Amino acid sequence: MNKENLTAYEVVTEENLTDIHSTGWLLRHKKTGARVMLIENDDENKVFNIAFRTPPKDSTGVAHILEHSVLCGSREFPLKDPFVELVKGSLNTFLNAMTYPDKTCYPVASCNDKDFQNLMHVYLDAVFYPNIYKREEIFRQEGWNYHLEQKEGPLKYNGVVYNEMKGAFSSPDEVLEREIMNHLFPDTTYGCESGGDPKNIPDLTYENFLNFHRTYYHPSNSYIYLYGNMDMEEKLAFLDEHYLSHFDYLDVDSVIQEQKAFGACRDVTLEYPVAENEGEEDNTYLSYNMVVGNAADSQMAMAFEVLDYALLSAPGAPLKQALLDVKAGKDVYGSYDDGILQPYFTVIAKGSNPDRKEEFVSVIRQVLGDIVKNGIDRKAVEAGINYFEFRYREADFSSYPKGLMYSLDILGDWLYEKGNPFAQVQQLTVFEKLKKAVNEGYFEELIRKYLLENPHGCIMTLVPKKGLAAQREKELEEKLEAYRSSLSEEQLDAMVEKTKALEAYQEAGEDPKALECIPMLKRSDIKREAAKIINEELTVDDSLFLYHDVCTNGIGYVDLMFKTDSIAPEQIPYLGLLKSVLGYVDTENYTYGELFNEINANTGGINCGVEVFDRADSTEEFQAMFSVRGKALYTKMDFLFKMIGEILNSSKLEDTKRLYEIVASVKSRAQVNLTGAGHSTAVLRAAAYSSPMAAFQDEMAGIGYYQFIEKLEKDFEQRKEETVEELCKLMKKILRPENFMISYTGERESLETVQKLAGAVKAGLGTEPVEKSEEKLTCTKKNEGFKTSGQVQYVAQTGNFKKKGLEYTGALEILKVILSYDYLWMNLRVKGGAYGCMSGFKRNGESYLVSYRDPHLKRTLDVYKGIPDYIRNFQTDEREMTKYIIGTISGKDVPRTPQMKGSVSKTAYFCGVTEEMLQKERDQILNASAEDIHALAEIIEAVLAADQICVVGSESKVAEASDVLMEVKPLINC
């Protein structure tokens, strides 16, 4: 890039970013003062992000509602929902927007130059010239509205963000996290809920909503980021000529103010709702929260990440273990939150009681005091440093673009204009400094200053209360009814008309001319060749060695797998438990704490899991593998396999005290996952009514598993010996040479070494005779409704079309896009107010429809029933069909990290998917027409005919739906 050509910009700084093999530029737009960062490199996955400082002054969620709303049409793209059109018709590798406590971000990414330019154009127009000033309906749809269908009917609140936040506030873990921040920074913007508190969202007026945009969405308050291999001069010229130069400088008062330190640590007690069947005992959250430094100190930030690891995250970590030993809670964990101006460190005991608070605080201070006096465990700190350095060097963010993650990290410094904004991508020097500081008392001093002698903190107690959800629901109904009753006939008529007007706006189709404004690619811009499967079938001592020859920059990815088809149905939940036990208990040569630290000090980690593969050609067959996954530099491969062997061959399961700690922690975290990902929970359970594979997964990781672990935790004292015995039997049954196979991703230079090491592991496996079970799980349709203390629903319906003699086709991938962003989006999200709606179709015929954070239940099931007619009447032109095809391919052509390439190829192997199948399906997608979509109506009818329904939702909504559900029961019983 030639600096002489940047006439509209002033170059603030230029840096050689050696850690990420890039050149960094910091610019300032001369006319507006807009801040611009460029990171130039050879990464084809290009990223654009424009962010604004958006500090809220209340908890009405204005920043969040605006984030949704600006993407609902703009000056150059006057559609109702250009965001959806982009999702449907671009080759994006990322497309979203995010609201944080003090900023709002609009990032996009694509590997296609033309597509990237289109995405950038639409997003810039959206943030600077949104249609929110022309259509109040946008605010009412995305934020909140009074919903009154007839004068005598019930008055309700609706709105996408309103329902999203009802779901967020249904999780006590999320409530605790939000309240900690609010109470640590009560006099700043962090004392407000940027996402919106459902009880405050209806206080937001349309005018205040518009004023927020006028105030903060200006180039002078913007942070613009470009990353990757592109013509930076061209992009900067576009930015200036089309947008920035059309504005004058504005002095925007958006500086984030620091909270003045407290004179003394504060004590806060709050309540949260639990369902009627849930116990209040052992359900309290205790938290110890301290403000630590500021966002500009990148070394301190990484040091506190390491302290979180050394004190709380690692098994046997001293603070965690001390709190568990005194039974301060059934699960103990911590976090370091640094995405705001003043980061904070938190210690949480979950599954506690209010009367344990004093001991909770006392133990924390005693343990930390002892560490300051006697020194921190050097090995634990060194392991923590290596843990974070390995991940920093690896830079594997799965399907998320690397440049996107760098952008979000950089904003953590850049937004506050303190320190070097490039510091987050120049961390290697920080790791070197921390390694030296281990022996210099640095970590002990941080503990003393910030965690022990710091008055700026709070002790928060979150106490469960039965009936609180029903009480709040009743109060809201009474409030709305009182308001409805206060209105005159004319006002009621006007409200009904306004409800109808919003529905009319939502039901109106897009203007064809407006649709043509959205730039899009052609089918010819899409590569026709399907991705290659990188599998070489080798052997090690007659066992399968599946090799994936991928450039991994010196890191080897190992997956040792053991077939589990010999286990009995009643052993499946123990398999789910075993993956949480191995690696977290003592072995012959290490305590569990030493084991964890040794592994993390020398490798990228080892973890156990269960991988389940469905056969593409069968509705019944599947393969479940117990897996031990690890990654390390090639030079550390021998150590990695040594530790894997240690875990597999010498783990000690008889320590029932440790076993109980694991069971209690698993239960605690499973509760969060069940409700936090309620859509996945409901889909898996509904599929389990007829699918052997789904039934297996449910017993091993779903509701069935949670019911097992819940009872086990409750009755552990009586069942501890039995549990040890079952786990030992299970290990003997599956960790055997005849069950062994391995998948390895790495460069060929490392292959021979890994084969030898794998052979040694196999040779050490047990061979004593065991009894193999031929019994299989049975599936039973139950159509369950699971009651929670939450305020929203997750409504799933599943079925298998192959069981009706129908075949899979690539066109189903297009149907998924059509349903998720047309029919379901319009009927469940736009009209119904649900935050999300999804569908999916697998090669073995398993299919699902599901809603996410949905205020409805029966209405949603009725929407599902309408899908076949919608498909039969589906009308589209060539341009729209091409858009759906591009959107479908976008989801399939996501750039893959080296680890992902190996994992995807391994999955294809065990699922029986060939390159020929992938190419055939891709051709079916690229050549699809409206007629191909019409033919899929029969498939949806087959899915719906299975009548498999599962709902996770509020007590009241689930109870009301007893006529469409066969069983209604609580999700959580204790």
Model-found features: residue ranges?
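Non-catalytic terminal extensions that flank enzyme cores
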Residues: 1-47
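His/Glu-based metal-binding/catalytic segments typifying zinc-dependent metallopeptidases
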Residues: 40-42, 49-51, 162, 166, ...
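M16 family metallopeptidases and their MPP-like homologs
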Residues: 45-55, 81-129, 136-147, 174-199, ...
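Active-site His/Glu-centered metal-binding helix of metallohydrolases
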Residues: 62, 66-70, 578
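Non-catalytic, conformational "gating/processing" segments within enzyme and secreted inhibitor domains
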Residues: 158, 210-242, 702, 723-758, ...
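Extended, regular secondary-structure scaffolds
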Residues: 211, 223, 232-251, 374, ...
